[in-house]
């Protein structure tokens, strides 16, 4: 087993407030995958990457789209997140999708987070303090009420080390991942690769998932097998709860396992139309 502790951090916030740029400053990678995203300068699909903090911690990053038209894509990525970085640009402050993302995260029960005040190099100190007061007022009564607000300039790399330190501090308070329950994965991407077939990605919520394991797809009730298994672009024989996982599935079409599907071992879960 990989000795590193695995956690998932998501971003949230209004369009063009610097989520993708912040992640590039943290990881050195660009999470805008699609040509359309590169051309338009906005995130449409979920973006994924990772980086290591010290010798013991691997942080998976989910970069969610901020534009209102792509809010359903944002929703598909929030399952399995250990914490959120709410990104607010200092030159604009709280905006429509900031509030919308905050409401969604609060409703689904996210418990931990950090507020990244980006683009601080574009405004003076007095304006920064006013925006921080506005943010504090907006997050009152939410899971971010006591969250630290970290001033950042991604282009100048200012505040990045402070952000990493706060991630480590929060991780130290998180419970250990549940490796003993049945594996469960919510699909947030589904696509086909020529020569390989259907591939899905998601965060493994609980348990462990093995190469060649037989699993069931809900709600399509299709039985399939794990043909290939990757964690952070590396082929593995077993994946553990808390890891970002890509799975090559045998004998199913991508239409059989759309975004939002759940992968579990057969005869372990039951479908329901009720929510408690």
Where in the sequence are the language-model features?
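Alpha-helical scaffold elements adjacent to nucleotide-binding pockets in ATP/GTP-utilizing enzyme cores
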Residues: 22-25, 97-104, 130-138, 162-170
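Residue-level signature of catalytic and energy-coupling elements of molecular machines
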Residues: 16, 22, 41, 61-63, ...
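Short, ordered loop/turn segments at secondary-structure junctions
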Residues: 14, 67, 89-93, 118-122, ...
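Conserved Switch II/interswitch segment of TRAFAC-class P-loop GTPases
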Residues: 57-58, 64-69, 79-130
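Conserved catalytic-core segments of large NTP-driven translation/proteostasis enzymes
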Residues: 137-276
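ATP-binding Walker
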Residues: 17, 65, 158
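Conserved G1/Walker A P-loop phosphate-binding module
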Residues: 1-61
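Signal for well-folded cores of large energy- and translation-related assemblies
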Residues: 27, 31, 35, 39, ...
């Amino acid at each position: 087993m990989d000795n590193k502790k695995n956690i998932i951090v998501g971003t949230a916030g209004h369009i063009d407030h610097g989520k993708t740029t912040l992640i590039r400053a943290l990881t050195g990678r660009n999470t805008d995958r699609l040509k359309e995203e590169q051309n338009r300068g906005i995130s449409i699909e979920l973006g994924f990457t990772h980086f290591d903090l010290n010798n013991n911690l691997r942080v998976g990053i989910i970069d969610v789209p901020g534009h209102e038209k792509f809010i359903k894509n944002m929703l598909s990525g929030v399952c399995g997140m250990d914490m959120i970085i709410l990104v607010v640009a200092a030159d604009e402050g709280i905006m429509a999708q900031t509030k919308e993302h905050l409401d969604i995260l609060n409703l689904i029960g996210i418990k931990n987070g950090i507020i990244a005040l980006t683009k601080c190099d574009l405004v003076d100190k007095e304006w920064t303090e006013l925006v921080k007061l506005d943010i504090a007022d907006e997050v009152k009564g939410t899971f971010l009420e006591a969250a630290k607000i970290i001033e950042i300039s991604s282009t100048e790399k200012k505040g990045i080390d402070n952000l990493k330190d706060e991630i480590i501090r929060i991780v130290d308070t998180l419970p250990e991942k549940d490796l003993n329950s049945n594996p469960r994965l919510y699909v947030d991407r589904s696509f086909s690769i020529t020569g390989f077939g259907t591939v899905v990605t998601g965060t493994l919520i609980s348990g462990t998932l093995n190469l060649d394991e037989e699993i069931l797809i809900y709600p399509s009730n299709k039985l399939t097998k794990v043909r290939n298994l990757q964690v952070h672009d590396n082929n593995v024989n077993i994946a553990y709860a808390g890891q970002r996982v890509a799975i090559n599935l045998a004998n199913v079409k991508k239409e059989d396992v759309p975004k939002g599907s759940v992968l579990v071992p057969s005869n372990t879960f039951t479908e329901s139309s009720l929510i408690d």
